[in-house]
């Protein structure tokens, strides 16, 4: 339905300013259009975005045809933990199949619902008894018990608005022992010997090596909070931690001060792990074998164990 020009609010109308506010005008007519444009360009432009979407649909269809995973022994020490959801389930499927094919033996898998898994969880459960899914309701109940919002307001706020923090909270809060968390978009091409050896006998934290240091916060502040000098290039695409040793009060305090002094940042989770690992020796995945930014040549003809 068309409206007459007189019915359309004009920016010169004082009532328009009062009802919408200058801040909302700035958001609507500048920040949102500019943000959308920059997002499109970061993804290579509209044609690249369409091609990416076409390939995503092909990958989803291919994931539906993948066979079940071989059943592991119930007490197998080889267990991977992944956060996943509607946008990532097919990546998770290929990640797990590539691991089993490269490692040559079954793996137990624990998946953590990012809040969007309900409609696609059956696609992952059909891979058989190797898969255990932690539903959102179960995760929230555990967090409410071990990280109640009145005692951990910053961690719980970040849990709502910053899903990456869930790779720490959802996997480790209220649970003991070593766990290896990996990103859903990883693929394995050679036997992941380093990771298998760690899983069989974990005795220190594990992390990958980044292609570019990305902590999101200044080193002096992070060093002071950690009480130690951070190691360079810590990457959490592979992250092995012992939930029994995590001090959640300390993590809450770190988050609060980092955000109060230098605002929120996409790399907060990586910053926290870099601070945790600064105080102890770590198992560091060999950068040449576990790549975080493979070249086009490597992508087309993989020689590394993972990327």
Task: Give residue spans per PLM region.
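N-terminal amphipathic/basic-hydrophobic helices that include classical n-h-c signal peptides
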Residues: 1-10
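N-terminal anchoring/stem segment of glycosyltransferases
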Residues: 12-147
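Short coil/turn segments at beta-strand junctions that form active-site/ligand-binding loops
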Residues: 76-78, 105-107, 176-178, 203-204, ...
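Active-site-proximal specificity loops/subdomain of glycosyltransferases
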Residues: 126-174
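A short acidic, often aromatic-flanked loop/helix-cap motif at beta-alpha or helix-coil junctions
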Residues: 137-146, 214-215, 290-295
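GT-A fold catalytic core of metal-dependent nucleotide-sugar glycosyltransferases
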Residues: 163, 167-213
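A short, conserved beta-to-alpha structural element at the edge of catalytic cores
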Residues: 206-227
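Catalytic core and acceptor-binding pocket of nucleotide-sugar-dependent glycosyltransferases
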Residues: 211-213, 229-307
């Amino acid at each position: 339905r068309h409206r007459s020009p007189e019915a359309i609010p004009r920016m010169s109308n004082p009532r328009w300013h009062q009802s919408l506010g200058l801040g909302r005008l700035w958001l609507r007519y500048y920040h949102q259009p500019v943000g959308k444009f920059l997002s499109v360009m970061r993804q290579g432009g509209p044609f690249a975005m369409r091609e990416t979407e076409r390939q995503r649909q092909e990958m989803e269809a291919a994931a539906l045809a993948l066979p079940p995973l071989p059943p592991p022994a119930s007490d197998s020490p080889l267990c991977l933990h992944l956060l996943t959801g509607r946008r990532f389930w097919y990546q998770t499927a290929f990640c797990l199949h590539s691991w089993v094919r490269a490692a040559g033996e079954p793996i137990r898998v624990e998946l953590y619902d990012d809040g969007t898994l309900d409609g696609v969880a059956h696609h992952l459960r059909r891979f058989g008894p190797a898969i255990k899914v932690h539903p959102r309701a179960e995760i929230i109940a555990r967090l409410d018990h071990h990280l109640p919002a009145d005692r951990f307001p910053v961690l719980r706020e970040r849990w709502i608005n910053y899903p990456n923090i869930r790779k720490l909270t959802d996997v480790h809060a209220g649970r003991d022992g070593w766990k290896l968390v990996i990103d859903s978009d990883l693929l394995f091409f050679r036997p992941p010997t380093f990771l298998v050896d760690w899983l069989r006998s974990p005795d220190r934290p594990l992390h990958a090596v980044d292609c570019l240091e990305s902590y999101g916060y200044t080193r002096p502040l992070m060093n002071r909070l950690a009480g130690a000098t951070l190691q360079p290039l810590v990457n959490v695409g592979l992250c092995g931690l012992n939930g029994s040793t995590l001090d959640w009060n300390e993590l809450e305090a770190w988050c609060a001060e980092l955000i109060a002094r230098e605002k929120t940042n996409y790399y907060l989770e990586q910053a926290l792990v870099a601070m945790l690992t600064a105080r102890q020796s770590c198992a560091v995945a060999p950068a040449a074998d576990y790549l975080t930014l493979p070249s086009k040549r490597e992508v087309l003809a993989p020689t590394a164990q993972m990327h």
